[in-house]
UniProtKB/Swiss-Prot annotation:
It is found in: Membrane. This is Protein ECM27. GO terms for biological process: intracellular calcium ion homeostasis; monoatomic cation transport; regulation of G0 to G1 transition. The keyword Transmembrane helix applies. It is a multi-pass membrane protein. Coiled coil: none annotated. GO terms for cellular component: endoplasmic reticulum; membrane. The lineage of its organism: Eukaryota, Fungi, Dikarya, Ascomycota, Saccharomycotina. Belongs to the Ca(2+):cation antiporter (CaCA) (TC 2.A.19) family. GO terms for molecular function: monoatomic cation transmembrane transporter activity. The keyword Lipid biosynthesis does not apply. Pfam families: Na_Ca_ex.
Length: 725
């Protein structure tokens, strides 16, 4: 356990760090792996589990007694969208929370400065770099923004402007107070209420938009789109038939035909016969069904049959060749080897022959069965624990290296984060039977044991404290309870499927119906319990990885003599924003799957607005939600922020160790000013005067380059301020 604690906490691993090759190379590798694992935790485990547990339809079995109504799905869709947006930004949120929660009374000012710098850096990258990249990509396509889309994006821009004004006030006051955090949390909550209400009132789509979405689902996206980025865990893959507008119902990562299956299917189609079935081929197939004869007569009969067929005779006409055989030339029909001749002494040679026969037969079939079982087991292991290696031969060198490196981490995540599928239980109305999928059930039994014990182990590593043996009684009891629950579930399914000869009276049918309802409720309860355990475990994993990154940044800050503010504005912000950049760019490229011009324009507009709205939502979540929630929890419940004052008077200064007292941190102010300028530019593009909008729309590529250059200039100014301060 000590080695795991040292690896997870760089301050313990690098006790005397210096700028040397022996420190820089492993530390940079440490940072890259931590960022990649954060993306894997969020996209592969946390997001799918939250999407599954928040959708009642996905918790029901196939053939459930409760119908999956569309109205219920639309009612929960908005809540699911909010939860999934929170999950996609979970690395930023948890790194923000950990920088506050792990502070001491001496380091709280620098830790909060790192948090504010990371948030402002992430907001600037998302609004300037990501939005600018979107504008550059969409500059080649004509877009038509509707009035509802314009009002929606204008509302989000105004909320983002208000959020940046609050951040500017905090930077000018050079402190964060409890009242500031309350205001931020209230502003984000009000944003959610307005957004959900507005979405519900204007969620109806035109028939043209619906037709375009249907056409998009029919025209599948290539399964190899951005495969190199998906393998690193930074990008949730864009799958075939991935409908963005309805992605919540299908989960974050809809299943797709793997590369191996796709290539096998393609080769099967290429190798199939493209010729028309002529008479000779059909006659040859008919002849193979007849009794075998010696080779010379068989070839003669096939020739005669072919000539008769070519003359226009029907295929069913018997050929003369079969009447030419003499008895001596008939095919020999021998009995099987087990039908041995009669012997007076059965213990004589019969036993020896039988043993030889059984040994040969059993040896052949046993080896074949073992090969088949090993191949099937290998397929199960790849499918369950290392699915990102299924198309390993088609990965680039860098992706293959990262895929191999992350294999042990992915296996540990899989063992600690149960993900029961929605189709674990299905009902066949014709047979009145339930069927269980074997592989997920086996995996749930394994995770029933591993997940509780890994939970205690992760907590021990995160707290850098060896838990007592009595603490491990809790995971032991929990594991036994989960195993008993699964066993009872399987037993009830088998009892329901048991054949009975009872009469189907009304009372018996009603009793069967009640048992079905209880069985389906048990299925739903099992899914919720395992999903909740998975969410708790993966949140602790994300907290551990985020804390490791923060400790690594603190080491570099001490070695280089840099402030935590500039580290948060640059390295930390870029590391947590790469995933947003890649996913939004890939989303914009989806319009290329449509060939019809009008559908192409409509889909391009739709994905453009989705990308812009997701960027603004990320800004609101990181700034108001992240700082507001983290600051409020820390200043109310963590002793390092308690200066024996009333709770509403508590505050923390944004003070670096190299700064004088009450000196403003101009890097924060510069960042806020440039972000506000970017928001004003977006307001002019979407809601400015018509002549300005037309000019900006024509020069979208130039506008996108200007947006990227805006944040590049802000970063340059911040670096100069850091160097000369």
């Amino acid at each position: 356990m000590d080695w795991a604690i040292n690896v997870a906490h760089p301050r313990l691993l690098y006790k005397d760090p210096k700028l040397s090759v022996t420190f820089i190379v492993p530390s940079l590798f440490h940072i890259i792996i931590a960022f990649v694992l954060l993306g894997i935790c969020a996209s592969d485990f946390l997001c799918p589990n939250v999407a599954h547990i928040s959708d009642p339809n996905s918790l029901r079995s196939n053939g459930s007694l409760v119908s999956k109504t569309a109205s219920h799905a639309s009612h929960t869709g908005a809540l699911m969208a909010v939860l999934l947006s929170w999950c996609n930004s979970s690395p930023d949120l948890f790194s923000n929370l950990m920088s506050w929660a792990t502070s001491t009374r001496e380091t709280r000012s620098t830790s909060v400065s790192l948090s504010i710098g990371e948030v402002l850096g992430a907001c600037g990258i998302i609004l300037c770099i990501v939005e600018g990249s979107i504008f550059i990509i969409m500059s080649r396509t004509h877009i038509e923004i509707s009035q509802i889309q314009k009002l929606s994006i204008m509302r989000d821009l105004l909320f983002s402007l208000a959020a940046m004004c609050v951040m500017s006030y905090v930077s000018l006051m050079n402190q964060v107070t409890v009242l500031n955090c309350l205001l931020m949390a209230f502003l984000y909550a009000f944003y959610l209420v307005v957004k959900l209400t507005f979405k519900l009132n204007h969620s109806a789509e035109t028939p043209d938009e619906t037709a375009a979405d249907t056409s998009l689902r029919e025209n599948s996206v290539s399964p190899f789109l951005d495969d190199s980025l998906m393998a690193s865990g930074l990008l949730p893959p864009i799958q075939p038939g991935f409908d963005i507008s309805n992605s919540i119902t299908h989960g974050i990562k809809p299943s797709l035909l793997s590369a191996m299956d796709f290539n096998s299917f393609l080769s099967m189609l290429e190798n199939s016969s493209l010729e028309e079935d002529d008479s000779r081929n059909e006659m040859a197939e008919l002849n193979t069904l007849r009794s075998m004869t010696p080779g010379q007569h068989w070839s003669a009969s096939a020739t005669v049959a072919g000539e008769a067929t070519s003359a226009g005779r029907p295929f069913s006409e018997p050929t003369n060749a079969f009447t030419e055989y003499r008895d001596s030339e008939r095919a020999i029909n021998s009995s099987p080897a087990v039908f041995a001749p009669y012997r007076d002494n059965p213990d004589d040679e019969e036993s020896q022959e039988q043993v030889l026969l059984e040994t040969t037969t059993h040896g052949h079939f046993g080896a074949q069965e073992m090969r088949r079982f090993s191949k099937r087991s290998l397929g199960w292991i790849i499918k369950i624990f290392i699915p990102h290696l299924s198309n390993f031969s088609q990965k680039s060198i860098s992706d293959a290296i990262f895929s191999i490196i992350t294999v042990p981490f992915f296996i540990i995540f899989k063992l600690s984060c149960p993900q029961p599928p929605s189709d674990i239980l299905s009902y066949d109305p014709t047979l009145n039977r339930y069927s269980l999928t074997t592989l997920p059930i086996i995996l749930l039994f394994i995770q029933s044991i591993t997940a509780p014990f890994l939970l205690c182990s992760i907590l021990s590593v995160l707290l850098t404290y060896h838990l007592g043996y009595l603490v491990y009684l809790f995971p032991l009891i929990l594991a036994m309870a989960l195993i008993l629950l699964l066993t009872a579930f399987i037993t009830k399914v088998n009892l329901h499927n048991k054949f009975t000869l009872s009469l189907d009276s009304s009372n018996i049918l009603q009793e069967k119906l009640q048992k079905r309802k209880l069985l389906e409720r048990l299925n739903t309860s099992i899914q919720i319990i395992f999903l909740a355990i998975g969410i708790i475990n993966i949140i602790i994993w994300i907290s551990l990885l985020a804390n490791s990154l923060i400790e690594m940044m603190e080491i570099y800050q001490k070695i280089l003599g840099l402030s935590k503010a500039i580290l948060g504005l640059t390295i930390f912000a870029w590391g947590n924003s790469v995933g947003d950049l890649i996913s939004n760019i890939s989303m914009c490229r989806l319009y290329k799957t449509q060939t019809h011009y009008q559908d192409r324009v409509r889909l391009a507009t739709k994905f453009f607005m989705i990308s812009c709205a997701s960027c603004l939502g990320g800004v609101m979540l990181n700034s108001m939600g992240g700082i507001g929630f983290s600051g409020l929890v820390s200043m109310l419940f963590i002793g390092a922020f308690n200066d024996n004052e009333w709770w509403f008077l508590r505050k923390v200064k944004l003070q670096e160790t190299s700064q004088l007292d009450n000196t403003l941190n101009y890097k924060f102010i510069v960042s806020c000013v440039f972000i506000i300028l970017q928001i004003i530019l977006l307001l002019l593009f979407f809601g400015g005067p018509n002549n300005i909008k037309r000019r900006l729309t024509k020069e979208m590529k130039l506008v996108g380059i200007s947006m990227c250059g805006l944040w590049a200039l802000a970063t340059l100014i911040n670096i100069l301020l850091e160097l000369f301060s």
